[in-house]
Design a protein with these regions (language model features):
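Short active-site oxyanion
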Residues: 4, 25-29, 48-49, 179-183, ...
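Conserved proline-anchored active-site loop of SAM-dependent methyltransferases
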Residues: 18, 29-43, 52-56, 63, ...
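Class I S-adenosyl-L-methionine-dependent methyltransferase module
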Residues: 45-183, 300-301, 305-309
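Long, positively charged, glycine-interspersed low-complexity recognition regions
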Residues: 221-324
């Protein structure tokens, strides 16, 4: 199935290729930079543990509400009309309000401070703050509508295109069923990876692309790219990372398998029809292991594509052509 939202850097155009390169066996699947969840939603549910994570609290809250409070979310969507640029701006301001928290949060924090001693008081306050960040249906509904009505789903400018929000009700119910057994997290990538790392874990990482970080709401600096590499370098499990193809990323991940791939550049289609965007998939395992286990008919089908260069720990080899 498709995601309920479009999102910057979404992997709809690349996900079939990603599935073919996932490990053959794993017991837990973790999307570290979940975004719109396109890879997760398109992946057939299985018996393994699934985790969706994004450091953007609005995204994590939206998917939490889709999973845990679908009826309340649908109700809120019905009562949030959006017919003009002014209303769009109002909703954006609404999402950034510091007061946009549980109406009882201040009282609960005060009670915890008054009746508990340290360090228990701090621990309880942290739990209360974390709980207040998720399950906020009004915020989820406002964020969902901002995405739907903004230009290019970028959440920054009004798209001017009419859209009937009621058409998404079925999609939300389908997403609710798909997320039934999925854990929703809102953590920094390093903390999340260390929490879920096991020898049988598989982490799919789709971080903000290098030197395009300004298109994302969450700040991601050059040192964060290095921190991600260093974190992944020490894990017990397996990982795959998708990035834009550039010299810096290739150098940063030179000790791992790197495969060059391309996808249609949706943002450029209006001005340059057929334009493609170069990307790389990076892994700490042999990405061809799943493809080699497939029937010959599937391998023959994959031959209808152009040849790709694979870099594996400093060595370059030619791989079978892939359908991109």
């Amino acid at each position: 199935m498709n995601s309920i939202i479009s999102w910057v850097g979404g992997k709809k155009a690349l996900r079939d290729l990603i599935y073919l390169r996932m490990p053959k066996n794993y017991d837990r699947y973790i999307e570290v930079f979940g975004g719109g969840g396109w890879v997760l939603f398109g992946k057939a549910p299985d018996k393994c543990m699934e985790v969706y994570n994004d450091f953007n609290s609005n995204l994590a809250n939206l998917f939490y509400c889709v999973k845990e409070r679908p009826m309340a979310l649908l109700r809120e969507l019905s009562f949030l009309p959006l017919n003009s640029r002014d209303e769009f701006t109002t909703l954006r301001k609404f999402l950034t309000m510091e007061e946009f928290k549980s109406e009882h949060l201040a009282e609960e924090l005060e009670i915890a401070t008054h009746f508990l001693k340290e360090p228990e008081a701090t621990e309880i306050r942290d739990i209360l703050m974390e709980r207040a960040a998720v399950g906020d249906v009004k915020r989820a509904a406002a964020f969902y509508k901002i995405i739907r009505y903004s230009y290019g789903s970028g959440c920054t400018s009004y798209g001017c295109q009419p859209f009937d929000i009621r058409k998404t009700f079925t999609i939300i119910w389908e997403a609710n069923r798909r997320l039934k057994d999925t854990v929703i997290e809102n953590k920094d990538f390093e903390a999340l990876i260390r929490q879920y790392d096991r020898p049988n874990a598989f982490f799919y990482c789709d971080p903000p692309y290098f030197e395009t970080e300004g298109h994302y709401e969450v700040v991601f600096r050059k040192e964060d790219h290095v921190r991600l590499r260093d974190t992944l370098k020490g894990i017990q499990g397996k990982f795959m990372v998708s990035y834009n193809d550039c010299a810096y990323i290739r150098e940063l991940y030179q000790d791992f398998q790197i495969e060059a791939v391309t996808r249609i550049n949706n943002l450029a289609q209006r001005y340059d029809n057929g334009s493609e965007f170069p990307e790389v998939l990076i892994a700490n395992y042999a990405m061809e292991e799943r493809k080699k286990s497939m029937p010959m008919q599937m391998n023959l089908f994959e031959l209808y594509g152009e040849q790709k260069t694979v870099r594996w720990k400093g060595k370059e080899t030619e791989e079978e052509p892939q359908d991109t």
